[in-house]
């Protein structure tokens, strides 16, 4: 039993990681210190940010090496914070282009006052993270094209209402409906 556990789940001190997974982590750690890889990653992320910025998408600037952050509050300036402009953009990107992103705004960080009114987060951002070794140039170009449609239809987006939320960490499991 112990031998099979080590083969399939890894040694007890590996934290449940198999040898294959630990090798993948080691390769990843080596790759991220390669100057050529780092340059490629940063240039790819900046390319995405620059191209959508040129189209008029408000982003946090300058762009870093991991992700592009879209300012959903500025993009959807007609949507009040209590209708969650960041989450609305997350949903639009997924529905229009199948692009998975994450809201970093009032869904994630908003709270309620004693009267049950939303205390909005200071920013309504959407993170377009670029995972390592996953996307090619054509994938990045596709995301840029999807923003053409997002911009074309932005006034039609009215926001969302939370219809079900847990007490804690609501950004993981809340349910929404379109307004």
Language model features with spans:
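Active-site C-terminal subdomain of aminotransferase-like
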Residues: 1-86, 91
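PLP-dependent enzyme catalytic core of the Aspartate aminotransferase-like
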Residues: 32, 96, 108-179
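Generic non-transmembrane alpha-helical segments
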Residues: 47, 51-55, 88-99, 144-154
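Active-site lining segments that contact anionic ligands and/or coordinate catalytic metals
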Residues: 63-67, 88-90, 96-99, 122-127
